[in-house]
Amino acid sequence: MSAKIIRIATRQSPLALWQANHVREMLVKQWPNLSIELLPMITSGDRFLKDKLLSAGGKGLFVKELEEALLDKRADLAVHSTKDMPAQLPDGLSLAAICKRDNPFDALISPQFKSLDALPKNAIIGTSSLRRQSQLLAYNPNLQVKTLRGNIHTRLSKLESGEYQAIILAAAGLERMGLAHHITQLIPDDIMLPTCAQGALCIECRTDDLEIQELIYGLNDPISALCVHTERRVNAKLGGNCHIPFAVYCTITAENLLLLRAKVLNLDGSQMIDDEQQGKIEEAEIIADRCTESLMTKGAMTLLSTIPS
């Protein structure tokens, strides 16, 4: 490996910086003589934190500037929460590594109520996710969902101020930031199925940069990568992004089979189309396509067409 300085592009949020430093530490552990610098950046998504993701332009806004830094070679790699990645990457860029997946589930946080079932009628729940909103209302239509934006600490502060009676956040982010003590309940996946790739960090680099790909090869977790890419395949075929209430989650069973579950909902959770597929690990792409085709046959695209663009 050459002696050049490796530059990691990252957002400037506390969670993003933690994630970039985590990757840096793993790289230095494997390559002790490596020199690594972080390149913190403010993304378009960070500038729109007070707006709904839907109106601001979607999750791709959180990676656009980082990808531009890769393409113009200001950075050698970028660290992302894989759930923030659009289904399609720009030409010339690849997801070269999926790190071992952390907690994929959603967490309820409430200073007053100990579970979703304990929430009173008309309780105000904060989230910026249409997926969470739809599944919450499908489970309990008597809840009120209110948009919640900002980084983790901002969202927790809004909860503490009394603006919400509970909020929903990704458990992985809370755990990475040492804030797991705030978690009131890990929401079971039969109530709230995770979003595509939730809990997994990814490393993006230039497709033709074989040196960087060799460098990060050891950070790729094969099982996590298999599950994440299977989820992303379904997501891509459905045109998935944060504009639609769509959930997909892939796991490996005790019998070493691939289990894939997905669901599409309307905004108020009154309509839901779901599917479950299982099969051999080596047939992951076939299973993903079978799941997609089943959802479409059941009317997923018709249901999604009712979601405002």
UniProtKB/Swiss-Prot annotation:
Residues of the signal peptide: none
A GO BP annotation: protoporphyrinogen IX biosynthetic process
Pathway assignment: Porphyrin-containing compound metabolism; protoporphyrin-IX biosynthesis; coproporphyrinogen-III from 5-aminolevulinate: step 2/4
GO molecular function: hydroxymethylbilane synthase activity
Catalytic activity as recorded in UniProt: 4 porphobilinogen + H2O = hydroxymethylbilane + 4 NH4(+)
GO CC annotation, single: cytoplasm
Family: Belongs to the HMBS family.
Further information: The porphobilinogen subunits are added to the dipyrromethane group.
Protein name as annotated: Porphobilinogen deaminase
Organism this protein belongs to: Legionella pneumophila (strain Lens)
